[in-house]
């Protein structure tokens, strides 16, 4: 019987659902069962055989399966694709992928879960590993997969514990029942065997958090470890570091909960993604699995090979050694006291005491093992619970965040729905207001249409009255035409009669001349003789003739005045009627145009209003439809408590929709009626407009002949246009001359550029001189060095001379050498002085050249700026020339047209003059005088109009001349300011340079001459232009005077 210690016996079965991925092997009796059950998928497959199988299991050799021991995170185990598994012992699913991935290093398993509680659909980071529905795929380490759920695993542990206790009881009873003749096992041997077995079997369940020394021995690269009790990872580095003293362990975590990427303070210890690396002291790192590269079988054989040496470090070895010492002391006492002749009963009691001690030791050992196992289990369960709590807390936090987000989204959607409802209501109110406004506008339009119809009736009455008046005027015109034809016929008859009466007129003229001669003679006689006496026979006849002459002259004057007044009145009446008809025509045209504009405006306004209404209603309908769809989409996903509001909103929206449809129908009907009315009115107005247009066309044909007569007044304008053409041609020639001069100036600028390039060559020569100077300095330095060497030799020779006075011959030789050296030194000094002088001269020349070059560079820069300014001015002038040439071309075309019209008008004038002369010849005296006066009045009006036109053209010409003179003055002023002073400066500055720049001075003088010539040209051009214009004006004045004389 087991002692009531209150402790639960430890479980020896395999735990596949351990959060740390560790597989716990039991005693010898359960190891084979676990190995077999791992293949069959049940941990209790071979533990139900009862206590009878325990001795055989204990006697069987320890051969655990390799797949049951290799349970590291990076080891795939014996899982296959399509196998049924549980993730963390909770989530059932099917394995669909096994291998490496791109999102994290190591081996991973892709599982398709039964429920949508996963994280993906088989794709991570844009890479697809398998296919499954959304939120049913998950990737995990193979160590977190089990073939059974967690509840069954805990049951297997309890069952293994019960079997273990049964085995211990059977062993205990077996050891107590044998007879005295049975073989007694020595204490040391039995304890060692049991300790070896228990140590080997319970080694995987023992905690790996021993001393630092043991951690250093066991931790290897690639081991799965637990850092701080919560973070799992793989060992990537073990050893000393630069950032702190002691032994440190570098771990690559499974999740981004670290602090680095394997590098600290610029030193890299291993490689991993950012936030996946973590360094910790070795005593804080707990190994939770074996390395993926070293199988568990090799580990177990290694432990068995260690033998008894492993027991020295185990906590049970000390108790075993103390028990053995107690047993040895108990067994040794009889031998010391000399009790060798004890009886067999005492011997049997001694044996029973030793067996009791052995059993007590075994029970203590078992209790110790159970406590250790329970401690390991508790630690594993605590670690599992902490990890599970962390995961649950994370899930709870995620669920809380999702719930809060969902609540916030639902509130936002509800708020949006409310806002949409409010906006729809506001839009409904706005639409009702707009409909009211549109109705008012339609009523206003109807009122306007009625007003237009009233005004249209008034206009029709006015047009009828005007038609009647026009008919009366046409009748009066016909009467006047008939009268004019009658007068023409009378004139023709008079012309025929005058031909017959010419001879009589000649005779009468001859008689008149004779009579005049006689009258003169008589007058002379009367003057000489005085008044005739009353009794003279010719006195009565003379008086009678005088009276007749006076009466004839008075009658002739009276008749001419009457005819003149009559013709003037008729002309004034005709002119007034013509003016009235013109005003009426213009008035009718304006009224017709206004009516057309009003009709078009009304139709366009109606169409615009209808288009606006249609677009507004369409947009409102589409907006309402969209808002309804959005509300349906948002409210369908919300909770069930919002269904009532959704129903209300749907009802409200349907009501609004029906109201809008009704309003649309009403508006469409009104629009159709209004459009039909407008179309009818438009057709009626078109008919009236066509009638008015026909009437206007008749009036226009009637007055077109009279307007063509007025066009003959513009014939004299052609002469002035021809004069303008001549002036323009002269100006074009002047501009061409200026263009030639500008081209010469451009050539001068190019020459200056060439001179600048020569100056640049000079600069290159100056650089060469600088190089030669540097070489001369180097030679001077070398000569100085030689001089120093010679002086040293001279000093050495002098020292030799002072020390050796005895050797005179040698001293003479040395003196000769010193003389020679002195001469060479003097020659070198002379050369050095010469070179110094040359160097100073060269330096002065170089400085002068530098100053000249800098001056030339500044001059070149200024010259380039001026050249650019001149080029810009040239381009501007060319553009002005082009515009002027275009204007002159257009003016020449206009002049040609005007000249043709002048020729036509001159021909018509000549024909009219011929007709007038013939009419004057054939007409009698009073009619001739009247026609002359009429024609003079007409010609005076025409001359006045022509004079006005001539004045306008002269003013235009003067304006053009002023613009041209201003542009010429501006151009010449720019030329004078920019080119001439700069050329002078360049001349004065280039004269101070070397002989290579003299050609530039000559060219500059040529350019200056060109500029002076250009200065003198504008005055000549202006004088020529002014003289030409003055001659033209003088000729025009002469022509006008001649015309006035005629």
Curated annotation (Swiss-Prot):
Any one of the GO CC terms: nucleus
Coiled-coil region: 354-524, 561-636, 673-1016
Keyword entries, A-Z: Coiled coil, Cytoplasm, Cytoskeleton, Microtubule, Phosphoprotein, Repeat, Williams-Beuren syndrome
Subunit structure: Interacts with CLASP1 and CLASP2. Binds preferentially to tyrosinated microtubules, and only marginally to detyrosinated microtubules.
Origin organism lineage: Eukaryota, Metazoa, Chordata, Craniata, Vertebrata
InterPro entries in the cross-refs: CAP-Gly_dom_sf, CAP-Gly_domain
Protein name: CAP-Gly domain-containing linker protein 2
Main location: cytoplasm
Composition-biased stretches (Basic and acidic residues): 1035-1046
Localization per Swiss-Prot or TrEMBL: Cytoplasm; Cytoplasm, Cytoskeleton
Naturally occurring in which organism (per UniProt): Homo sapiens (Human)
